[in-house]
Regions:
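Hot-dog-fold acyl-thioester-processing enzymes
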Residues: 2-68, 115, 119-231
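HotDog/MaoC-like acyl-thioester-processing domains
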Residues: 2-15, 72-84, 89-163, 236, ...
Length: 275
């Protein structure tokens, strides 16, 4: 067996599907929000491997919640491209754990990697609680070291994000790039907006962001040029539910000869909370 075969054998298999044409962006490859959607699909299999089945979670009033996701995009996926998901535990903590996910094609070429911090959540008290002992035992058997190809590269892993008011963000230089409501079909089995739709708000804000900075994105695409996201980090600060109104504010943090670093902040219009 090769070292890669040995490594893959340690991971929990799960999602297996393809990229649909309607999931691809104006550059012709899978929109980044759908990578996060695949990550959510893979999470079902990881919860199952950890003994967290949907019925027992509902009956006990518990769930899991993503607190931070760091993603690196290693290869573009186009319409019809096959995707195979696998995952493992990287670090087990009292109320949270770090999970590794990866997606590869049918030839095992790496497409994307995720380093995700998840927590065990009391759905009634709306707070994190300790993992069940049975889950801790299963997690210990599914643990690996984070592979180098998933380590943060240009976007560092973060820490807990404190609330920043919309007014303070605007004063810092953020400007409005998007706005939308939360639909019922965007919410997961735990009742809050699925992570991929947090990312969707950002991908929809992107063209407005560059247009407001004076960059003609349609013209770029017509000339055979465009943008590709290589790495991103998501911090989930507050839950969003069906009917909430979300506003996206953005700022250009850094520009280099090969790329740029952009920060987006999502605000709940009704409560003013950073989401």
């Amino acid at each position: 067996m090769t070292s890669q075969t040995d490594f893959l054998a340690k991971l929990v298999p799960g999602y297996q599907g393809i990229a649909q044409k309607w999931e691809c962006d104006n550059m012709g490859h899978l929109n980044v929000s759908y990578f996060f959607g695949r990550s959510s699909d893979q999470a079902f299999f990881m919860r199952h491997a950890l003994g967290l089945n949907p019925a027992s979670l509902r009956d006990s009033g518990h769930g899991t919640v993503a607190l931070e996701e760091h993603c690196r995009f290693h290869r573009e996926v186009t319409s019809g491209g096959m995707m195979i998901g696998r995952s493992a535990v990287v670090e087990l903590r009292a109320r949270t754990m770090v999970v590794y996910q990866e997606f590869r094609d049918a030839q095992d070429a790496l497409q994307a990697t995720f380093r995700t911090v998840i927590g065990f959540f009391d759905t009634k008290a709306r707070r994190l609680v300790p993992w069940p002992e049975a889950t801790r035992e299963k997690a210990a058997k599914l643990s690996i070291d984070l592979p180098p190809h998933a380590a943060p590269l240009r976007v560092p892993a973060g820490s807990a994000v404190a609330h920043v008011s919309r007014a303070d963000s605007l004063a810092e230089g953020f400007f409005r790039t998007g706005g939308a409501g939360v639909n019922s079909w965007e919410c997961d089995q735990f009742g809050h907006m699925n992570t991929m739709f947090y990312v969707r708000r950002q991908t929809e804000a992107g063209p407005h962001f560059w247009q407001l900075l004076g960059l003609d994105q349609p013209g770029l695409i017509a000339s055979g040029r465009g943008f590709a996201v290589s790495e991103m980090r998501m911090n989930y600060v507050d839950e969003l539910y069906e009917g909430d109104i979300v506003e996206t504010l953005s700022i250009l943090r850094e520009v280099s000869d090969r790329g740029a670093r952009v920060e987006h902040r999502l605000y709940n219009v009704g409560t003013g909370a950073l989401s």
